[in-house]
């Protein structure tokens, strides 16, 4: 009997232990609330208004909130706007640095400005991040870890690949809510929180932030019904939620900040976190340890809103592309000149030129959705950068060409190929000659004769075409020799062009109507 009672007691203890484990309180669902004051660099106003009013409102209002509310954390993106704070509001800028060191003013977005990510080249997007991170390191001793683009008009499949290879771990936006139609089943986005895999398999975390202009009226957010509902939209039992202002900068309302403070201390069913824009991403690191995270492969694009911007303001897009190409060519030539000990690398000039035009890749600037007045500033900056890049390219090529072996029998001509692959094409060149030549012959660096044609001679200048071949990011020397007679005379009449091989007849429209050999 005693043995029976002892066994029963042991069973009760085991059951009691199991019961105690099952009655442990469940973890509360989390609400990551992210304070922001998204500021359009240009839109319905120009950059002068941004600096004079919106940048000032942003730094001054948030400094007041940071002093008054100890749990308040503010997130702000765009290195160029921090540079304007430093230049125009230096006292407030120095005060802001203290809160950055404390982790309460958070550098979001990693980039020089919150750029469009569909029109710019991959090189530009990487430069944008590189320039932003460089500024943050030099000024604040920190780096950002996320892509923070609340207001762009769509996101290509290359973005997670670019971000991951730049050392970033996450991306957030609210713009997909602006779609007219569902994109993924009944939703406008694949999930509210998950992993976005890029074209090469690299992944970053994605969080949907909902409306960036959200306000609360001095309530306890730990009991907020909307946040409780939003956290059910993901099996992760949490919500990532922007609050603050959009477009004009400034700060969240006092009522909103008080609501967050009350929520942090509240006893409701939600755990409220006054979060940096990247805290959610850091909490899930490393991602390989979280198989519960859904994964998406593909693009995150808009369907109606903003889509027309990719064909508007064509001049702006032309200048931008010219700067991308000229900047790349200038960089290549400058690096080569330094490598050959012919010139010092003009790092500050190139950095200034990149910064000047890249901030105009902002999502309301390059895209063509700003007021006409704004583009007077944009075009001016684009042309200044083009001139800076052109000067670096020209001086670098000249310094290299000056050391090349150009000892030829005739007139030497150096051709430069700025592209990253070999080019064989017809090159038009101009040389100085004392008199009009009757014929020309052109030889390459190996002494091989190449096809050439004299186009024109006037005012001591001869224009000619050369069938040229130039290596990738390289140079080629050609030897141009003149002769007293043409090797292959050409007779030109009203409608015919004839030499010893061909006779071509043109019709009234200038089209070839016959070709005889």
Please identify what each model-predicted range represents:
Residues 21-418, 425, 437-455, 459-476, ...:
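Catalytic-domain carbohydrate-binding cleft regions of carbohydrate-active enzymes
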Residues 425-433:
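Glycine-centered coil/turn sites that cap beta-strands in beta-rich domains
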Residues 432, 469, 481-483:
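Solvent-exposed residues in well-ordered beta-strands and their adjoining turns
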Residues 3-6, 10, 478, 488-490, ...:
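Residue-level marker of intrinsically disordered, low-complexity segments enriched
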Residues 9-14, 333, 430, 439, ...:
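Compositionally biased non-globular segments, especially hydrophobic aliphatic-rich helices
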Residues 9, 14-16, 435, 456, ...:
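Generic detector of low-complexity/intrinsically disordered segments
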Residues 1-24:
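Bacterial Sec-dependent N-terminal signal peptides
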Residues 481-517:
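Beta-strand-rich N-terminal accessory domains
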């Amino acid at each position: 009997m005693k043995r029976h009672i002892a066994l029963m007691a042991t069973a009760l203890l085991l059951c009691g232990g199991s019961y105690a484990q099952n009655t442990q309180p469940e973890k509360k669902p989390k609400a990551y609330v992210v304070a922001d004051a998204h500021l359009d660099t240009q839109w319905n106003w120009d950059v002068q208004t941004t600096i004079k009013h919106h940048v000032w409102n942003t730094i001054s209002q948030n400094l007041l909130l940071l002093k008054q509310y100890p749990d308040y954390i503010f997130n702000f993106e765009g290195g160029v706007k921090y540079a304007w704070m430093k230049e125009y509001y230096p006292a407030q800028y120095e005060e802001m640095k203290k809160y950055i060191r404390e982790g309460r003013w958070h550098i979001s977005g990693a980039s020089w400005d919150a750029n469009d990510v569909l029109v710019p080249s991959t090189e530009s997007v990487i430069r944008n991040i590189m320039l932003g991170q460089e500024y943050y390191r030099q000024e604040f001793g920190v780096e950002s870890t996320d892509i923070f683009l609340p207001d762009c008009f769509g996101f290509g499949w290359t973005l997670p690949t670019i971000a991951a290879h730049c050392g970033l771990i996450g991306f957030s936006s609210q713009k997909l809510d602006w779609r007219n139609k569902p994109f993924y089943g009944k939703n406008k986005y694949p999930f509210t929180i998950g992993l976005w895999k890029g074209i090469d398999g690299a992944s970053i975390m994605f969080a949907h932030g909902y409306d960036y202009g959200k306000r609360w009226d001095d309530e306890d957010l730990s009991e907020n019904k909307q946040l409780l509902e939003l956290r059910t939209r993901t099996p992760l039992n949490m919500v990532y939620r922007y609050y603050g202002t959009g477009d004009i900068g400034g700060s969240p309302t006092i009522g909103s900040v008080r609501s967050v403070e009350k929520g942090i201390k509240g006893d409701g069913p939600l755990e409220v976190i006054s979060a940096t824009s990247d805290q959610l991403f850091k909490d899930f690191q490393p991602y390989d340890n979280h198989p519960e995270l859904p994964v998406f492969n593909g693009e995150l694009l808009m369907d109606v809103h903003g889509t027309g911007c990719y064909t508007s303001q064509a001049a702006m897009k032309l200048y931008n592309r010219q700067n991308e190409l000229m900047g790349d060519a200038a960089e290549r030539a400058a690096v080569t000149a330094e490598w050959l000990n012919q010139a010092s690398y003009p790092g500050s000039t190139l950095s200034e030129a990149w910064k000047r035009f890249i901030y105009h890749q902002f999502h309301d600037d390059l895209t063509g959705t700003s007021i006409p007045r704004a583009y007077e500033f944009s075009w001016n900056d684009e042309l200044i950068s083009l001139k800076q890049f052109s000067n670096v390219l020209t001086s670098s090529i000249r310094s290299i060409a000056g050391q090349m072996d150009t000892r030829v029998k005739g007139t030497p001509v150096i051709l430069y190929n700025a592209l990253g692959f070999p080019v064989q094409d017809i090159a038009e060149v101009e040389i100085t000659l004392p008199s009009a030549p009757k014929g020309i012959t052109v030889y390459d660096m190996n002494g091989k004769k190449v096809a050439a044609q004299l186009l024109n001679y006037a005012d001591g200048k001869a224009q000619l075409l050369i069938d040229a071949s130039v290596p990738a990011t390289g140079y080629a020397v050609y030897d141009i020799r003149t002769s007293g007679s043409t090797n292959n005379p050409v007779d030109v009449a009203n409608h015919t062009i004839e030499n010893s091989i061909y006779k071509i007849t043109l019709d009234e429209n200038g089209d070839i109507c016959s070709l005889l050999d």
